[in-house]
Curated annotation (Swiss-Prot):
Guanine nucleotide exchange factor (GEF) for Rho and Rac. GEF proteins activate small GTPases by exchanging bound GDP for free GTP. Along with DOCK1, mediates CRK/CRKL regulation of epithelial and endothelial cell spreading and migration on type IV collagen. Residues 443-627 form the C2 DOCK-type domain. Belongs to the DOCK family. It is found in: Cytoplasm; Cell membrane; Cell projection, Podosome. It comes from Mus musculus. Interacts with CRK and CRKL. Interacts (via N-terminus) with tensin TNS3 (via N-terminus); the interaction increases DOCK5 guanine nucleotide exchange activity towards Rac. Interacts with ELMO1. Highly expressed in lens, where it predominantly localizes to anterior epithelial cells, and is weakly expressed in lens fiber (at protein level). Expressed in brain, eye, lung, spleen and kidney, but not in thymus or peripheral blood leukocytes. The modification Phosphothreonine is found at residue 1793. This is Dedicator of cytokinesis protein 5. The gene is Dock5. It comes from the Eukaryota.
Length: 1868
């Protein structure tokens, strides 16, 4: 059978396609995933993706590209390491890590960072490909490596990832192979480098000067890249463009010219140069770049005829000035602008050609008028005036160029900017040397500038048109070909012709050309200038011959080169042939200076010189500048170099050498040094020369130390080791040096000695090399001791010098300390290292204490850096001295320790001791440990965390601890003399470690440094833990504080953020685990062991250690949790056994407190909850005494954790404030039950803040009230936990309670809960009045209370709606899951808005359309289902309002507040559907919800704890509907009767809807359904209810009669047709009803106003139950009979009209209570009715009639009378007296229901447009305008309005008529 074969070669690969697994055994892969392959089988591999090692699976072989890899630990635990270059691996890992972050940036919409990372990623991918290609040369690969690592480091910093530390070659440092100090320094360097890079990029973006300054400080040479794009100018002839850099402030050219030859066709003359005209101006130094202004100037010279308009017969080929173009490039050069792509336009300014100045020099710019520039003004002036001109009239003509500043010399520029600078790029050099002269830069450029001339016009009437021709000849008169270079970009020319100015007597040219001649030719060459007049007529021009000649020799007679500067040349005239004969004219003086000198000589000797008679009339001036590395213009230097031929001047020349320019000396460095040593050796008899040569040598060494010549250091080194050969120089040099040091007090020698000390390093190299050569030639001869003695003598002289008082020669002392160590490595070659070490020790000891401290420390640092310290035997000598000096510096009593220098010295010592190639170091580490460890610790403890040296000292401390072996630790402890010393040391160390762990010294991204610190600390902590166990464990020696510090340190270490692996990316996590393991486990297990070691001492750590141990157990590492959670049980057991109380309350309270803090701080998870409960239960159940209490505690903690985790999850992840509040309340209740007031109060304020943020002021007040309830009105002091978080400064409970009450009252006021505010203010007023006697406060409080009373009556207060919400499904959090909550809506919030708000909180929830309770399938579903519908609050009126006439505004409050019961009605059909009358089978299901708490409360919602469901029959529904209709009519009639100003429209609509059969359809549905014989036979029990329904129909007629009457009174012209229609319909209706159901007449008082108290409106209100009684009660005075012969006239006494309403007052007032005389069988109906009626939105204007009870009905001793009955007489209802119980029982009405709490005044009626939560309307369908949900005052009948629109209340009535039915209009 085939089987899977382990792979051997195929170990590592990359997925090249996406692979989606179709089975569990398969492994899904994405392109780019790397896989470790374990086995293979028939085209399949088995293995895992390196991104997720836990999931193994199979995948197709063809999907994988195999790569080379090495396998480590072969077998089951093998790991693969890719075989790629380390850099490629790093690139790959970086790209993988960045890719994850890149996606997150996109998701989080961080566009800028996303784009930056995208660009960086693309760069890295491209570079990775280049490296993998393997085609790069070694140097390019090294360069690319630098770019890659810089980019990675910058990207990591940008993304907040860890800093990668590297060696000099860019390889990642391995912390195991690197010393701690080197690691620290590498971090510093990397951090600084990245910071500089970021700053540079920022300044580029901000165009700041910073960038330039940063570059200038590091780079010394620059190039300016110019790309010439186009030249737009209509010349019509060829032109030459000379582009150069110019300093307008100095009026000097900085660079040579870049020449472009432009054709007459508007293209370059050489067509191949099209689009390829570019140049680099090199050698610019930082001093050039910081010039205030730099311009790029272009001079355009026309090559053609004298004037443009001239014809063919005129002379052509003349070079004529045409114009200039100038651009200020200061911003580009200063680094403010850097965009090589941007094209700059340089406007061109042409020379004016006006005829009236033809006789003058041409003017360069049309903007500069002729009288501004004089005719002989030089070009620099013209340029400067052009630069000064602000506007340019360029007419679109000019040059287009792009520019870029390139850092580096020419070689660097060509290398770094190869995309810009190639072989075709012209190189224009600076006219002068760069800031740094490179030894290999051979240059021999002679710049010649034609300045001006003056030429006699001779026989001509006008000045000549002079052309100067310049060429180079040797002394034989041979022309040097192509020696003259007019500009870069073209080869040289043999002749250079100047520009011709037209008829100018004194032409100024300012044309510069470069002459390039081989060095060996220079001595033989001269430059010749020929002058010729050029005619504009070709024929005449041909006949013109040169009229003059001038020349200049390049070498002076003394061998020096022609001096820089201006030279006036002699112009010779005469025979052309003679003038062209070099042998002839070279015998004549070339310059005026030579001429004058020869004339002077001639005056002495007349026969010597006879110049031409014409030679002095014309003048010609040039300027020269020589940039040569081989020619000197210095006569003194030349004299020294040729000292043998001029030996008498040696002393003079040696002295003069100090004045020679450095540039001249370095050119001839080797020759100069040879001359010096030759003089020293050959003139050895004369000691004077020794000193002069020594000083000259010092001068040259100092010169090369200058930054300008720093690159000549290698040249000097090469000279010393390759060319220097003076074997006895060491004798003379050391003798002079000794003399200088010994005579340091001589002021004349001070400067010389100081210079010698600065040059000491190279002086000694000469001395030692001389000695080495001597020994090589002569062997160790007798003078061996002489040399050694001279070295000893030198040190002795230095020691004497250092011991002198500080004021003297402080500069010399400092220099000695600074430069003396630099000789060590050289001296060691020829001098005994041990003795040298001793000499240096004595040298250091010779310096008095507290003098030159820093210099001394720096000197010792350099000694340590030398190779001397790397020799073990030398270290034995030096280290004790170094540690003593450091000990003195770090001593506690040291006044001003130099921390910087000390840390530098200490770091260097430790770095050397960490090396493996320096011999044995153990004893040296021990020495440092003994003498310095505690000093270092104390320095760290005492140093500010902001100190720049803290990092360095901590690194030193880590280094010492890291280098200590186990034996060192035990030895160190043994060095302490007393036990107290050990305690002090351990205390210091523990405190310091904890402080360093708590406040990171190193940046977070210094991951390697931080992990190194952690690893070293861990080992040290464990070492010291052993000391604790051994020395401080038993009863006698136990140190509580020490152990306590140990535990706190260990916990701080374990919980340190750098060790929390789960917070890191997978890549980082794997990296850390692989390198360091999980250190938390190691320290955690040690904590556990140390705890169990404590034995009986444990009780001392309870409860203080509960918090720290909890932190340990909360670490999300399962093994660690399992190991440490049992410590809790141990603590419980310990307290139980040892506290003496037989409980573990201390532990319990502490655990609850700390658990709350930790979970809120983000620690803990579901797994922890389960594990904690499980482990505690396991241990407790095994314990004899803790079984019960322990088990209870385990469940308690588990419950607390559940609440806390829910709370935290919601707080962190859920933006819903409601969910946050729910969780807060759950936690709150838990702590309330546990009587943990401290935490309870904390969460109260969290809840208060949440409410305040949501503007739930009422709920915020109720929340604060819970805090206030914990306080007493007493002078007891406030314990700290009672004080609130944002505490008032109070001392007693009474003060705090008062402050809280004031805050609560203000919240109630904001929430319009004035009733509650009044209640609290009464309590507070009592305190003010009778306890604290604060009358001022009382007055203020009473004013507020008065305002609250006024607000209740007058202010508008919208009633909130209530909603039932069911959360079904397992997708909801546990505190919501499968529960129903009642929500109190916000002001004016409708159900639709509320639903939307809910769905926003739960975007994944599905909204249920049905209001029926869902089934189990939905409840157990993993989804979220939301059910939401409106419920009606059931009013619960306080007993104090019973039997009292309460104003409507007061009652309104109780309709929606202080409620706990809510109802919801849902219509449904029962039985067979009747197609003719659907109403007959329409039942109502009424659900009642009772909440856990009363509304409003501390939340805007509470859970429904009780739910009951009842059904209401169609008949009862009909009765309710009829009652509601009658109520509506009654209320509307009352309102209109009471307030005539009300709009008549609502009344019109109401009446129209009832009386118009076209609208309503009459009562036929009821008649068909209930008034049939068949129904009564089937439902005999409904007889009474049917009769009641008939009477309700009958009762409607008198109400409608009153309504029609009022409608008639308030009639407008528009409404007359409507009123006529209403009257007609009503007559028909009335006739029908009275005929079928009898007549009821209302008493006249029903429609009268009653007088009320001023300021309030008391509106008598008739309930439907009252109206019902009107239809059945037989009361003589209750009916106005139309019959004159009424039988019981006598009983109609005054006041008896109230008897009808007497039972009403009592029953309304106790609307929520059961009326005691109701028949028992009616209770259920009453309850059903109550819920049903509450579903209607009740009026806000209901009040209770103000009426004194009749004595016979309401007297105290009597029971409430039942309503009396009515009897039918002649189809009319006639009242009669009958107290008969039979009658009253037979005709007693249905039970009184809480319809008593309802009113239906027109502004708020909501009977139409019913939702599913309310019963349907009466059978006839209403029209749109029937809706009674409208404003009674303002809205016309046809327009429906929003249900919640409210009219402001009218002013109170002036007077009140007596009446029964009336209502306050519009009151809301």
């Amino acid at each position: 059978m085939a089987r899977w074969i382990p792979t051997k070669r195929q170990k590592y690969g990359v997925a090249i396609y996406n692979y989606n697994a179709s089975q569990d055994v398969e492994l899904s892969l994405q392109i780019g995933d790397t896989v470790h392959i374990l086995e293979m089988y028939e085209g399949w591999y088995r293995g895992y993706a390196l991104q997720n090692r836990s999931k193994k699976g199979i995948f197709p072989e063809t999907y994988i590209h195999l790569k080379e890899a090495t396998v480590e630990d072969g077998g089951q635990h093998e790991t693969v390491i890719p075989g790629e270059l380390p850099l490629v691996q790093e690139l790959t890992n970086t790209l993988r890590e960045w890719a994850v972050i890149w996606r997150k940036l996109y998701v989080n919409n961080k566009v800028t960072l996303f784009r930056q990372l995208q660009q960086m990623t693309y760069s890295l991918i491209e570079w990775r490909s280049q490296i993998l290609s393997g085609t790069l040369p070694k140097d390019e690969l090294a360069e690319l490596k630098k770019k890659v690592t810089a980019k990675i480091d910058h990207g990591n910093r940008m993304l907040g990832l860890d800093l990668v530390v590297r060696d000099d070659n860019g390889n990642i440092l391995d912390p195991d192979e690197t010393s701690t100090v080197a690691l620290f320094r590498a971090h510093e360097v990397a951090s600084k480098r990245i910071e500089e890079k970021i700053q540079e990029e920022k300044s580029i973006l901000q165009n700041l000067d910073l960038r330039g300054q940063a570059i200038f400080s590091t780079v010394h040479t620059y190039g300016l890249y110019v790309n010439f794009k186009n030249f737009v100018c209509n010349i019509g002839e060829d032109a030459e463009l000379f582009i150069a850099l110019y300093d307008p402030d100095q009026s000097t050219f900085i660079s040579e010219n870049y020449l472009i030859r432009w054709g007459s066709n508007g293209m370059p003359k050489e067509i191949e140069k099209l689009n390829n005209l570019q140049a680099v101006f090199t050698d610019l130094s930082s001093t050039d770049l910081i010039r205030p202004r730099i311009s790029l100037v272009c001079q355009i010279v026309r090559v053609g005829r004298m004037e443009l308009k001239e014809g063919k017969k005129h002379t052509c080929g003349l070079r004529r000035p045409f114009g200039v173009a100038v651009m200020d490039i200061s911003d580009i050069v200063h680094g403010k602008v850097d965009d090589e792509e941007k094209q700059h336009f340089i406007p061109f300014q042409q020379i004016a050609m006006e005829t009236y100045i033809r006789q003058r020099q041409l003017i360069m710019s049309p903007l500069i008028t002729s009288h501004v520039i004089g005719e002989n003004e030089p070009l620099t002036s013209v340029l400067n005036k052009v630069i000064a001109a602000k506007e340019v009239n360029h007419k679109g003509q000019g040059l287009w160029v792009s520019l870029k500043l390139l850092p580096g010399d020419l070689t660097q520029v060509q290398k770094n900017f190869s995309h810009l600078v190639d072989r075709s790029t012209a190189i224009a050099r600076k006219m002068g040397f760069p800031e740094i002269i490179l030894p290999g830069d051979v240059r021999n450029d002679i710049y010649v500038t034609l300045i001006h001339g003056e030429f006699d016009k001779g026989k001509k009437k006008t000045p000549k048109n002079v052309e100067v021709t310049m060429s180079v000849f040797d002394e034989e008169g041979n022309l040097l070909e192509k020696a003259i270079h007019p500009g870069a970009g073209y080869e040289g020319v043999s002749e250079y012709k100047s520009v011709v100015y037209y008829q100018v007597k004194q032409p100024c040219w300012y044309e510069t050309v470069k002459v390039f001649i081989a060095i060996e030719e220079v001595t033989r060459c001269h430059i010749r200038f020929t002058f010729r007049h050029r005619s504009s007529q070709e024929s005449r021009d041909k006949s013109e011959r040169a009229f003059g000649v001038a020349f200049v020799k390049l070498m002076n007679a003394d061998g020096t080169t022609l001096q820089d500067g201006r030279h006036d040349l002699v112009v010779y005239k005469g025979d052309n042939k003679k003038m062209e004969d070099a042998k002839y004219y070279l015998t004549l003086p070339g310059t005026k200076a030579e001429l004058e000198e020869k004339e002077l000589q001639a005056s002495k000797n007349p026969s010597v010189f006879t110049p031409s008679k014409d030679s002095t009339k014309d003048s010609f001036q040039i300027a020269t500048l020589i940039c040569s590395t081989k020619l000197t213009q210095n006569v003194d230097l030349l004299g020294l170099l040729n000292w043998r031929s001029n030996s008498q001047n040696i002393k003079h020349n040696l002295k003069k050498l100090m004045e020679v320019d450095g540039g001249e000396i370095v050119k001839f460095l080797q020759d100069t040094l040879d001359a010096l040593f030759n003089i020293m050796m050959e003139m050895s008899d004369n000691e004077t020369y020794d000193f002069l040569v020594f000083d000259a040598l010092v001068f040259i060494i100092s010169l090369i130390g200058d930054i300008k010549f720093q690159h000549f250091n290698p040249v000097l080194e090469t000279y010393i080791y390759k060319h220097f050969s003076a074997t006895l120089a060491h004798v003379k040099l050391s003798k002079v040096l000794n003399f200088y040091v010994a005579n340091a007090e001589d002021p004349s020698k001070t400067e010389l000695l100081f210079a010698a000390l600065k040059a000491l390093k190279y002086l000694f190299r000469f001395i030692i090399q001389s000695r080495v050569l001597y020994l090589r030639f002569y062997g160790q001869s007798e003078d061996g001791d002489e040399f050694n003695d001279s070295i000893r003598q030198l040190f002795l002289a230095f020691n004497t010098l250092m011991d002198r008082p500080l004021e003297e020669a402080v500069k010399i002392k400092g220099a000695a300390l600074k430069y003396l160590p630099s000789i060590i490595n050289d001296v060691k070659l020829v001098f005994d290292p041990m003795e040298l070490s001793v000499l240096f020790c004595k040298f250091i000891q010779s310096i008095p204490d507290n003098q030159l401290v820093r210099q001394k420390l720096n000197c010792m640092t350099k000694i340590v850096e030398s190779s001397l310290f790397q020799q073990a035997e030398c270290r034995e000598v030096l280290l004790p001295l170094l540690t003593d000096q450091l000990s003195g510096q770090l001593d506690d009593h040291s006044t001003k320790p130099d921390h910087e220098a000390s840390s530098q010295l200490l770091s260097n010592i430790l770095e050397v001791l960490d090396r493996t190639d320096v011999g044995p170091t153990s004893a040296h580490v021990q020495l440092i440990m003994e003498r310095l460890l505690r000093r270092i610790n104390r320095t760290v403890i005492g140093m500010s965390r902001q100190s720049p040296h803290i990092g360095s000292f901590v690194a030193c401390m880590i280094a010492v601890l890291r280098q200590m072996e186990d034996s060192h630790y035990s030895h160190y402890i043994s060095t302490f003399k007393t036990r107290q010393d050990i305690i002090d040391f351990l205390m210091e160390t523990f405190i310091m470690f904890k402080d360093l762990i708590g406040k990171n010294v190193y940046a977070k991204d210094w991951m390697v440094m931080n992990m190194t610190q952690n690893r070293v600390f861990l080992r040290a902590i464990n070492q010291f833990a052993e000391v604790l166990t051994k020395s401080f464990m038993d009863q006698a020696s136990f140190e509580l504080q020490l152990w306590n510090n140990y535990f706190h340190l260990a916990v701080a270490f374990l919980t340190h953020e750098s060790l929390q692996l789960e917070t890191f990316s997978e890549a980082k996590r794997n990296k850390i685990v692989k390198k360091y393991g999980d250190m938390r486990k190691e320290i955690g297990f040690r904590i556990r062991d140390m705890w169990y070691n404590l034995g009986p001492h444990k009780i001392k750590f309870i409860p203080s250690m509960v918090g720290p141990i909890l932190e340990v157990t909360l670490t999300p590492e399962v093994e660690l949790r399992k190991a440490t959670i049992p410590i809790f049980f141990d603590m419980m057991q310990c307290e139980f056994n040892l506290s003496g109380n037989g409980n573990f309350h201390m532990f319990e309270n502490e655990l609850i407190t700390k658990l709350d803090q930790e979970v809120e701080g983000g620690r803990g998870d579901e797994q922890y909850k389960v594990l904690l409960e499980k482990l505690l239960l396991e241990h407790c159940r095994k314990h004899k005494y803790l079984a019960n209490s322990g088990e209870a505690f385990a469940f308690l903690v588990s419950s607390l954790l559940e609440n806390l985790l829910d709370y935290r999850t919601i707080i962190i992840h859920d933006e819903s404030k409601e969910n946050r509040m729910s969780c807060t309340v759950n936690v709150l209740n838990f702590y309330k039950d546990k009587k943990r007031e401290d935490i309870y109060i904390r969460y109260l304020y969290k809840l208060r803040d949440l409410h305040r943020d949501c503007e739930n002021y009422t709920e915020a007040a109720y929340t604060l009230l819970l805090h206030a309830e914990l306080l007493q009105w007493s002078d007891k002091p406030c314990v700290p936990h009672l004080l609130q978080r944002d505490s008032y400064y109070v001392y007693t409970q009474q003060e705090l309670k008062e402050k809280l009450y004031q805050e609560i009252i203000s919240y109630f006021d904001k929430g319009k809960m004035w009733e509650k505010a009044i209640k609290l203010s009464k309590e507070l007023a009592e305190t003010y009045e009778s306890k604290v006697f604060d009358y001022e406060g009382l007055g203020s409080l009473l004013k507020k209370r008065a305002l609250f009373y006024e607000n209740i009556i007058k202010a508008m207060r919208p009633q909130p709606e209530y909603f039932a919400v069911g959360y079904y499904g397992q997708g909801f959090p546990s505190f919501l899951r499968n529960k129903i909550f009642i929500y109190r809506g916000k002001e004016y919030e409708r159900r639709e808005d509320f639903s939307l708000r809910l769905l926003t909180q739960f975007p994944n929830a599905e909204k249920m359309t049905s209001t029926t309770p869902p089934g189990e399938d939905i409840k157990s579903s993993p989804k979220q289902y939301l059910q939401c519908f409106t419920v009606k609050p059931v009013m619960s009126l306080p007993p104090s309002y019973k039997d009292k006439p309460v104003p409507e505004q007061i009652l309104n409050y109780y309709r929606a507040n202080e409620v706990q019961q809510f109802s919801y009605s849902r219509p449904f059909r029962k039985g067979e559907k009747d197609p003719e009358n659907e109403f007959a089978t329409m039942w109502i299901e009424r659900t009642t919800y009772r909440t856990a708490y009363t509304f409003p409360g501390i939340l805007k919602w509470f859970e429904a704890k009780e739910i009951s469901v009842e059904e209401i029959s169609p008949l009862e529904n009909a009765i309710e509907t009829m009652e509601l209709t009658n109520e509506r009519v009654s209320n509307c009639v009352q309102q209109h009767a009471w307030d005539h100003s009300l709009s008549v429209h609502p009344l019109s609509m109401l009446l129209s809807g009832i009386v118009d059969p076209a609208v309503m359809g009459g009562f036929s549905n009821y008649e068909k359904a209930f008034f049939t014989e068949k129904y009564l036979q089937e439902h005999p029990e409904d007889q009474e209810k049917v009769e009641l329904l008939k009477r309700l129909i009958a009762l409607q007629i008198p109400l409608l009669t009153e309504g029609i009457r009022i409608h008639g009174e308030k009639l407008t012209e528009q409404l007359k047709p409507l009123h006529a229609r209403l009257s007609s319909c009503f007559r028909e209706l009335k006739e029908k009803v009275e005929k079928l159901y009898g007549v009821i007449t209302l008493p006249p008082s029903m429609t009268e106003r009653k007088p009320s108290r001023a300021g309030s409106m008391v509106l008598p209100y008739i309930l439907s139950s009252t109206l019902r009684r009107l239809s059945v009660t037989s009361v003589a005075s209750s009916v106005i009979s139309t019959s004159s012969n009424s039988s019981d006239n006598a009983s109609s006494r005054p006041g008896s009209d109230g008897s009808i309403l007497e039972p009403l007052f009592e029953r309304r007032a106790s609307s929520g209570a059961r009326v005691e005389d109701l028949p028992p069988k009616e209770d259920s109906e009453n309850r059903i009715s109550k819920f049903k009626r509450k579903d209607w939105n009740l009026s806000k204007s209901q009040v209770i009639a103000e009426k004194a009870p009749e004595p016979d009905v309401m007297s105290p001793g009597k029971k409430t009378q039942r309503p009396k009955s009515l009897q039918l007489v002649d189809s009319r209802l006639t009242p009669f007296h009958s107290p008969s119980p039979l009658q009253s029982t037979a005709l007693s009405p249905p039970p009184l229901t809480p319809k008593a709490t309802r009113t239906l005044s027109s502004p708020s009626l909501q009977t139409d447009g019913l939702t599913a939560s309310v019963p349907p309307p009466p059978p006839p369908k209403s029209k749109p305008y029937e809706s009674s949900q409208r404003n009674s005052a303002e809205i016309a009948p046809p327009l429906p309005v929003r249900r919640d629109s409210k009219a402001p209340p009218p002013p109170p009535p002036k007077a009140r008529k007596s009446g029964i039915l009336s209502s306050e209009p519009g009151s809301q």
